[in-house]
Amino acid sequence: MAYNKIISFFFFSTPFMVNAQTLPTEKVDVIKDFEVRLKDSEKKDFQAELPVIKSSIVPQTYNVSAKPIQVSYAPPAIRPLALKKDPSATIYNSFLKIGGMLPAGFEGNIGIGKSAENYSIGFSAHHAQLNNDSKFENQKNSWTEGHLFGTYYTGPIAIKGQLGYAIERLHYYGYQFRTTEDSASITNFPSEQVFQSFQSLNASISVSNAKENDLKVDYTLHTNFYHLKDNYAAREQGLSFAGHIEKWIAEKHSVDVQFEGATNQYRDTADQNLSYLNLTPSFAFRHQIFKVKAGANFVPANGEFKIYPSLNITSQIIPKGLIIEIGVDGKRTMENLKSLTQFNPFIKTRIQLQPNDRFNVYAKAHGSIGKLTYEGEINYITESALPLFNLVAGDVIPRFNVQFDTVKTIAIMVSGKMPIKENLSLSGKFISRTFDVSNNDAAWHRIGVELEGGLTYTSNNQKLLASIFLNQYSRIAYLKGGIEKAFLLPILELSAQLEYQFSPRISSYIKVNNLTGNENARWLYYNRYGINPNLGLQVKF
């Protein structure tokens, strides 16, 4: 049907198309352009204005109280990145270190450890010995110690324990360095006649909070027991204890109580017993730039209490550049066989236990200037029973008597450390002590001046470590010939060390002590060892 309509339209329109082709061309005008023209008009300016606002609203003042809004946020979704991570460094729990020394020496260290989520245990042992008997008769000594230790975590509590044994063997070899002015003959002695040993067994346990608790209280309780004996029938056993309880206030201030004390029993030809206790409550106020801690130390003595002030003020004068600290404190300590033989092993071990009341006024400063990190300190110390050491009169084998005296000491210390080039750093320390002794002419065998300096280099890959250190000790007074004051020759010791790591497990070291060969004595007639090379290897596993 649609096709029929199209065909019919075609036939009807054809005659008109044919007739149009017969029209003359001059009869048709084609208009190509058409322009619209407006009548002349006059331009008028018009300024728009906003309509007048009709409203009865007046300005209002609102006071809104600040109120924190508790908003719970869902934990962020952590998605792993498609990046290759560097493998973490392997942690080794055990090591073995062995080395040889001259003259005729050996050193060995071993450590074995294991840890889990709620405990850690370990064992360590150390042995060192030197024998210069071929040069100086009986100049030889050795040291051996071993320790078992561990920590157990149970809830918010950490329990630490330690059990150890140590033995030190030495000889009173100073007889061969005596001079004729001592009116003592120089005699050869078999080793067993000048032999001394100190054997000690110790055990300790401590309890502390391993994490923050709801009461905002931190605490630590510690106790230690030891038994010490020597080769001359001296025996000592002691029990020490200490604790610290701190209550935090407003997250920054604190009230704390510290206590520490000990009880000792010494046996030789007679028994001696001595105990002491320090109890120190204090309050600490902390501000953004300063801290003040004030309290007092109560010391029971003869049925009464001695009271020492305890004050510490710390202030940041220049952020990181200068921090100063001033304070005063006092406490009681004890001089016993253990502390005396650790300081001077060449004493005559028939001693007197002695309490020592120590009072200290101090000022400190530390910080950094550019690359330099520094620290300075000055102390004015009074001690009621500072141990001094002089030779036993008329004893052919040199041993030292212990003398207690009231001594006032002014001690000045300055130290610093600074990198001078990449991987190269310089460090140093200077200490000066001036003694004012009540009943003696000098602080016998106490060091007056100490000087330390060091240069350390570490390679970029951390495999090479090289260092050189200088130690100097001087102004050590002694009683010459039993009648006059004199000073020991200065001790000057230069040491160098080189350590190289072949792999994460294996490294080696070489260390040379006393490169200058300075044998000057720390204790009268007990000349030190000369040049002491040490070569060794360390393996981690």
Which role fits each region the language model picked out?
Residues 505, 528-541:
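Outer-membrane beta-barrel "beta-signal"
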Residues 128-199, 259-272, 277, 295-310, ...:
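Outer-membrane beta-barrel translocator/channel fold
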Residues 407-475, 504:
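Gram-negative outer-membrane beta-barrel transporters
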Residues 352-354, 366, 375-422, 438-440, ...:
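Outer membrane beta-barrel strand-and-loop segments of large Gram-negative receptors
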Residues 78, 87-134, 138-146:
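Outer-membrane beta-barrel translocator/receptor signature
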Residues 110-114, 123, 148-152, 203-209, ...:
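Residues on the lipid-exposed face of transmembrane beta-strands in outer-membrane beta-barrel proteins
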Residues 118-122, 156-160, 212-219, 249-257, ...:
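Repeated loop/turn-to-beta-strand initiation elements of outer-membrane beta-barrel proteins
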Residues 90-92, 104-106, 140-144, 195-201, ...:
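Residues that define the transmembrane beta-barrel architecture of outer-membrane proteins
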